[in-house]
């Protein structure tokens, strides 16, 4: 939200200002909010190299997430695009404080690498929900649940916002979560 207010360039400059980070966290705490959501539109595998991610993108984001966690605020991050090459970086957080929602990331690897400490969320493709059959949608959801649910820490949902989904596919997504998503 701060990015919407400040604009992208100002936000990038502000990330170096630890006082601004402290003031922002204090305002979040004062508001009673216990989760902060981050849409990560520019960190995916195709936007920058792993070396660039490691040097420029990840250190400041990790620092911000840890500052929130230190203040008792959970971080929920939406990873637009593919984060397959980022998974090894993004899971080193205290257990139960960080949620990663994925759009086009290999969910088996995401669960394997992140699932011990972080909640993994996603990634039923919006194209499947918009254009797929009911049977294909249910089968995709079943496989995702079988892959990601063991051990807990998984939420079945769309990979991105779904604005054009077929109602019957949304219904079958919910039915599949009730049928296959029961922890035993």
Please annotate each region the language model reported:
Residues 1-184:
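Active-site loop segments of alpha/beta catalytic cores
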């Amino acid at each position: 939200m701060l990015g919407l207010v400040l604009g992208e360039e100002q936000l990038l400059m502000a990330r170096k200002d630890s006082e601004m980070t402290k003031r922002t966290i204090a305002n979040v705490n004062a508001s009673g909010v216990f989760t902060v959501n981050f849409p990560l539109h520019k960190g995916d595998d195709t936007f920058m190299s792993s070396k660039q991610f490691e040097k420029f993108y990840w250190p400041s984001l990790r620092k911000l997430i840890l500052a929130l966690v230190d203040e008792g605020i959970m971080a929920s991050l939406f990873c637009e695009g593919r984060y397959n090459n980022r998974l090894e970086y993004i899971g080193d957080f205290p257990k139960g404080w960080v949620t990663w929602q994925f759009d086009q990331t290999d969910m088996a690897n995401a669960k394997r690498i992140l699932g011990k400490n972080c909640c993994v969320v996603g990634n039923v493709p919006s194209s499947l929900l918009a254009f797929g059959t009911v049977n294909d949608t249910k089968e995709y959801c079943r496989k995702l649940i079988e892959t990601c649910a063991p051990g807990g820490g998984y939420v079945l949902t769309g990979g991105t916002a779904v604005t054009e989904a077929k109602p019957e596919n949304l219904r079958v997504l919910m039915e599949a979560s009730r049928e296959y998503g029961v922890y035993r």
